[in-house]
UniProtKB/Swiss-Prot annotation:
It is found in: Cytoplasm. The keyword rRNA-binding does not apply. Its cofactor is Mn(2+). Binds 2 manganese ions per subunit. This is Probable manganese-dependent inorganic pyrophosphatase. Its EC number is 3.6.1.1. Mn(2+) 2 binds at residues 15, 77, 99, 151. Mn(2+) 1 binds at residues 9, 13, 77. It holds the Pfam family DHH. It is an enzyme of class 3 (hydrolase). It comes from the Bacteria. One of its GO terms (cellular component) is cytoplasm. Its main location: cytoplasm.
């Protein structure tokens, strides 16, 4: 019997890596499954900081499940097939642990599926450790905490669930870190954009959404200075246009998020800019506009685009 691969979404962020890493451990300890954690991309700088801090080896990167001899997969931090492994339609989805909308998803067989409207997939996995009476090792606690901090911007994002505060406190204690100090260090590690090429920058944290027949790419970068990113606008737009031509995206929306002041600048290019402007009730000037208080793609960008596109 081949191993069940456990992984997060393409262009993995910290929650994708952390939740899959922890769920792989839980699957073996609590459910007796023969699993292996893998990743659909290399860790970004924020995730690398967490992995290094807690002495965790990055999961190996794969592109196909069948190429690894696997016929079954477990998805964490995503469920939409266009965000998953290349041959997702050719394998059996054994389980899903997620905190996003459910869309473009169907299976031939029954499966384990746990989806909750909380701040991170890591929050759900931690709760499952407790439910099954499995002790959380320090390194796993640290990674789960990192996933929660990353997705909620240290519990400041509107996606933060009331239960996430207690989860963060408990995980910080298990990981033996100060929540605020470690949280800020983690987030700042992810804002080093100067060393990134424009191609890398628009792919750090990007997901594709099928909206009423349109392939809309929504990417996000975190920074402490939006103006520094906009100084590279011409080169960023060139990279975006190349990606659109290569991948067939109808529209590309880049969130440039200020993690200190909790605002974003939206840079958008594509065939449906009228719908993008209507979604956020703003007017793009030189392809970008300010979106006050916006820090969450999941709650403050994708639902608005979905409604505006009539999806």
């Amino acid at each position: 019997m081949s191993k069940i691969l456990v992984f997060g979404h393409q262009n993995p962020d910290t929650d994708a890596i952390a939740s899959s890493y922890a769920f792989d451990y839980l699957s073996q300890k609590a459910f007796g499954l023969d699993t292996e954690v893998v990743a659909l991309g290399t860790p970004n700088e924020e995730t690398a900081f967490a992995l290094d801090y807690f002495g965790v080896e990055a999961p190996r990167v794969v592109e196909s499940a069948k190429a690894q001899g696997s016929e079954q997969v477990i998805l964490t931090d995503h469920n939409e097939f266009q965000q998953s492994i290349a041959d997702i339609r050719e394998v059996e989805v054994y389980g899903v642990v997620d905190h996003h909308r459910v869309a473009n998803f169907e299976t031939a067989n029954p499966l384990y599926m746990r989806v909750e409207p909380v701040g991170s997939a890591s929050s759900i996995v931690y709760r499952m450790f407790k439910e099954n009476g499995i002790e959380v090792p320090k390194a796993i606690a640290g990674m789960l905490l990192s996933g929660l901090i990353s997705d909620t911007l240290l519990l400041k994002s509107p996606t933060t669930h009331v239960s996430d505060h207690l989860v963060a406190e408990e995980l910080a204690e298990l990981a033996e870190v100060n929540l605020e100090d470690y949280g800020m260090a983690l987030l700042k590690a992810g804002t080093n954009l100067a060393s990134k090429s424009e191609v890398e920058l628009i792919g750090i944290d990007a997901k594709t959404f099928e909206l009423n027949g349109n392939a809309v790419r929504v990417a996000q970068v975190n920074t402490v200075d939006i103006s520094e990113v906009l100084e590279r606008q011409e080169a960023i737009e060139a990279a975006i246009k190349d990606a659109m031509a290569a991948e067939g995206y109808s529209d590309f929306v880049l969130m440039i998020t200020d993690i200190v002041n909790s605002n974003s600048e939206i840079l958008a290019i594509g065939a449906n800019m009228d719908k993008v402007e209507a979604a956020f009730n703003f007017t793009l000037d030189n392809n970008h506009a300010f979106l006050a208080g916006a820090v969450s793609r999941k709650k403050q960008v994708v639902p608005q685009l979905t409604e505006s596109f009539g999806a």
